[in-house]
UniProtKB/Swiss-Prot annotation:
Keywords: Ribonucleoprotein, Ribosomal protein, RNA-binding, rRNA-binding. Belongs to the universal ribosomal protein uL14 family. It comes from Sinorhizobium fredii (strain NBRC 101917 / NGR234). GO terms for cellular component: cytosolic large ribosomal subunit. One of its GO terms (molecular function) is structural constituent of ribosome. The gene is rplN. GO terms for biological process: translation. SUPFAM superfamilies: Ribosomal protein L14. Gene3D superfamilies: Ribosomal protein L14 (2.40.150.20). Coiled coil: none annotated. InterPro entries: Ribosomal_uL14, Ribosomal_uL14_bac-type, Ribosomal_uL14_CS, Ribosomal_uL14_sf. This is Large ribosomal subunit protein uL14. It comes from the Bacteria.
Amino acid sequence: MIQMQTNLDVADNSGARRVMCIKVLGGSKRKYASIGDIIVVSIKEAIPRGRVKKGDVMKAVVVRTAKDIRRPDGSVIRFDTNAAVLIDNKKEPIGTRIFGPVPRELRAKNHMKIISLAPEVL
């Protein structure tokens, strides 16, 4: 459950380390984002010589949340941290690598490129 002002880790090699959610996309009254949703983020911490720099405003896909997600078979999946992957306007990842596991719920939201780059799909 990601809302405005939530800090997230960045799970790719785009150069950003921490981002903050500044908007949840998908309707004017939408308050929360979950896994696979697109949010607008501000880069709060970045490494030198990265593809992005501190202060940039970008779009991102939420790939991990600390709030548990119920699956249709009754199982529950949750992660230790909130994490996102930065994307461009064509919904393609900016980075070339994804760090950490991602859930298979991303497949239903048509984020196939993130699924293919991820080292593990849960």
